[in-house]
Amino acid sequence: ALETLLELERNPRPWRKGLYVDPSNYAQIGGWTFDKEGHRTQLNFDTCYPMVKGDPGEATPVRIGRAREDTCPHCGCQMVDILVLDGRDERLKFLGLAGILTATCCPNCVGFLKGPAFNSFTLDGGVEVFPSELFDGAGKMDCYVRPEDYRSLTENPFVLGGAPMPLFYGAACDDVNTVGGFANWVQDWEYTACPHCGKPMKYLAQIQWDTLMDGTEGTLYIEFCPDCQIVSMQHQQT
């Protein structure tokens, strides 16, 4: 497949003019891409773990929805560490993270941004949230996340499952939260370019909003650049 797509990239056929994107884009649905020299880059991991409902107070190396004190500049909602992942756990060794990855966003605005939400992370748990812009260019928007919604989000029972699932488990189900493997893209697959180095980010996890808060829709996809230690979070829904 790589040889064929590289040939089409270097020598476009006449029918290319009728396509919206280059044929090479379709490699991404298989979880990989390549550069102009033909060097292949994997965009996902070949191991998939589910997030399952655990017992109250159960220890877990992956936490969804940890409360924060700071607030969103757009809507005033409390920010949230939507994913906190300790790569030192034996189950997560496949990620190649020698510490903690934290993904931070506004649970109200992350679906209304122009592009993904970004933050940098340090392996000791530190976070720096990048500035963001609302999709319509407005400076402010209403907050639709009620206090009881935020409490539901940050007190959810999910913990990392004890055993891996099939590689395409996350892609085949629209009601599961997963780490690794393939995503169930609501729309088209979308691998974000790292804002620092420009390389495509690697898919890390997906979170279904309706598993955390009643009355919500869509999926949050979390990707990261291991070299630059930057995380992206993007929302899709029907």
Positions of the model-derived regions?
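Preference for intrinsically disordered or flexible, low-complexity segments
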Residues: 1-238
